[in-house]
Amino acid sequence: MAFKKNNTKRIYNHGFNWLVAIFLLMFSSISYGQETSENLEHSTSLELSAEQEYNANKPILKDEFEWQFALDFSLVYDPIIIAGIEQDELLHYFMPGLLFDISYKGFFLQTNQRRSNALLGGTEFGYQLVVEQNWQLDVIAKAYMQGYDPAAEIEYSSGDEKLLAGLRERNVTLGIALRYSQYFENSLFTLDLAATTSGDDEFDKSVRGVIIDSFYSYLLPYRNWDIYFGAGLTYFSQDIVDYYIGVGSDEVNETRPEYTAKGGFRGQVEFYAQHPLSASWSFNAGITHSLYSSNVKASPLVDTNQVTQVMLGVLYVF
């Protein structure tokens, strides 16, 4: 149940390339050859729209074409529960990224900017099914779990060869979910019911499962800060957990017995804060503590069932 990106040789979600292509086709007919004054006018209207959305804290019908891009420059302490994989060089802590929000005719491609782990990878492609005054229902596609590549960790990231040698690569888990969002005055609750697919198991069969992901986020504005307090609970079905921390017959060695994992839960508490530095730059900081079911420690691949992630960085918004 590891949420890990190989910091030197990252594991990318190639399954979303086609989503980007769809958006390029959808918006290719839109002309960007406008006058400078019109571009400034358009940017101003988007800023006003974003401000209205923030103040209302209500569902926004994503009918018009709107976009926003941001460059992320973050230092992230990102431990995982898998033994033998650690950040041991300064470069491993630096995680730049591109965050983007695009919407048109109910379709959207977005990052969850209420959470610190959005900076660790949380792009969502979706469509609004129902939009009411205080709630909405969407269908989304996203990566729910990051994979890990033991061979790459050993070669590029100083992974522990004794613990990782002989393990198969674990791919990203992709999911298509029905998401319910309930808006309150200063908070938001979301619930995802996701059908997922991961890589192949030791028998070359695609691993499929279910993830039920819930999260509550409360916004506390303080002076010029946006401070978010969050808590979440996630259920992972047995097939998914076994794919990540189980040990197949082809992976057994003297210190690593065969192991079949059970389904499990992950609880999270989170603090995330944003502070504008200028019209384009903002400071971001977050800390997330994750606690997994105690039975995950029975896996020969796992040395702890709880991790704490810390992030400090700045964003440049176009």
Model features per residue range: what roles?
Residues 34-110:
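Short glycine/proline- and aromatic-enriched beta-strand/turn motifs that initiate or cap beta-hairpins
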Residues 73-75, 98-104, 125-127, 176-182, ...:
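Residues on the lipid-exposed face of transmembrane beta-strands in outer-membrane beta-barrel proteins
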Residues 77-96, 112-114, 151-168, 298:
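Surface-exposed strand-loop-strand hairpins of Gram-negative outer-membrane beta-barrel proteins
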Residues 88, 269-318:
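Predominantly the C-terminal beta-signal and adjacent terminal strand-loop region
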Residues 106-110, 135-137, 186-191, 224-227, ...:
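Repeated loop/turn-to-beta-strand initiation elements of outer-membrane beta-barrel proteins
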